Amino acid sequence: MSAVTITILMILGAYLAGSISSAVLVCRLRGLPDPRTNGSGNPGATNVLRIGGLSSAVMVLLFDMLKGAIPSYISYKLGLDSVYLGLVAVAACLGHIFPIFFAFKGGKGVATAFGAMAPIGEDLALFLLATWLVFALITRYSSVAAIIAASLAPLYTWWLDERFTIPVAMLSVLIVIRHKDNIHRLWTGEETKLSRKKRDKKTT
């Protein structure tokens, strides 16, 4: 099988994997409101945190990361060129953003992109995670933390392993573009800050 055929199959598989909306599925399984029509309207881990609590958000986060990590790792093991590897990673993110199984209404793709970058190396993953956490804690805006982490990702990659700078840059551009509405809301002061749903404790 040629490298082009393998790449096409991996791109298709990555898109289909990315199209599995874990936020919608987790909310359905746990009897939570549909994240596409509640909270911020974004079917991602941050919105699930708002409407469903920490445990549900963690489940969504881990699954979304795996959607990016598994196709990228398989492509890496198959020896695909770094640009082709980038296309596979972008396909997984596009599946998350425009899921064919959920009327093409998806999330921002941040967790999936992070998962796709993680196989490059644990150093990069730690840098990105630390960057997101620092700016999320400072600003209380998940979108700001995501945009800054995505913008710095190509620089981190160039420093750690320059072979993968181009595919990471492709993901970074996609993430920043996907946050255009958040950037507008930040500019107008309408962006929602991070918060966690507080459940009422039942008394017995």
UniProtKB/Swiss-Prot annotation:
Pathway: Lipid metabolism; phospholipid metabolism. It is a multi-pass membrane protein. It is found in: Cell inner membrane. Pfam families: G3P_acyltransf. Keywords: Cell inner membrane, Cell membrane, Lipid biosynthesis, Lipid metabolism, Membrane, Phospholipid biosynthesis, Phospholipid metabolism, Transferase, Transmembrane, Transmembrane helix. It catalyses: an acyl phosphate + sn-glycerol 3-phosphate = a 1-acyl-sn-glycero-3-phosphate + phosphate. The chain crosses the membrane at residues 6-26, 51-71, 84-104, 118-138, 141-161. Its EC number is 2.3.1.275. GO terms for molecular function: acyl-phosphate glycerol-3-phosphate acyltransferase activity. One of its GO terms (cellular component) is plasma membrane. One of its GO terms (biological process) is phospholipid biosynthetic process. Belongs to the PlsY family. PANTHER family: GLYCEROL-3-PHOSPHATE ACYLTRANSFERASE-RELATED, INNER MEMBRANE PROTEIN YGIH. Catalyzes the transfer of an acyl group from acyl-phosphate (acyl-PO(4)) to glycerol-3-phosphate (G3P) to form lysophosphatidic acid (LPA). This enzyme utilizes acyl-phosphate as fatty acyl donor, but not acyl-CoA or acyl-ACP. Probably interacts with PlsX. This is Glycerol-3-phosphate acyltransferase. It comes from Shewanella denitrificans (strain OS217 / ATCC BAA-1090 / DSM 15013).
